[in-house]
C-alpha cells in the first residue's frame, strides 16, 4: 500500500503517463472530432507532455515543488494545438496545488486534479462540454468526492482512471459533433 507519493515517485508517474500517452496517440488521434476532426489531438498532447518530461529531466532535485514547476514550464513552452494548451493548463493547476508539499496524499492528489481542471476551464474562453475539459472535470469531482474514503494512492489512481473512462464514454451524449460521428472524444 502506498499512502503518499514523494517527488521521486511523482516523477516516475509523469514519465510513465507520458509513455502511455505516446503509445496511444494514434488511438487518441482517431477520437478527435472537435473543434475540427483533424486527427491530431493525440499527437499534440504527446508532443506537449514530451516537452514537459524533457524539462522535468533537467531537474536534479526530487522536490515536488521543483518538479511541478518544471512540468508546468515544459508543457506550456511545448504546448501544441488546443489539446496541448488545455493539457498544459491542467498541469499548471496541478503544479500550483502541490507547491510546497513534501509528500502527496490521496486528498492532495484529488485537490491537485481539481485545481488542474479549474485552471483549464478558466483558460478556455468558451468551454464546451463533451471534450477533454468534461473528462478532467468529472474525474476531478469524483476524486474529491472519494478521496476521503481511499488511503492507497495506487488503488485511488486505478479508480480515477476507471471513472475517467466512464466520463469519456459519456462524451457523445454531450457534444453534437460526437453524436453525428457516433464516437468518443478527448477534445
Regions found by a protein language model. Give the residues of each.
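N-terminal loops that bind phosphate or other acidic moieties
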Residues: 1-185
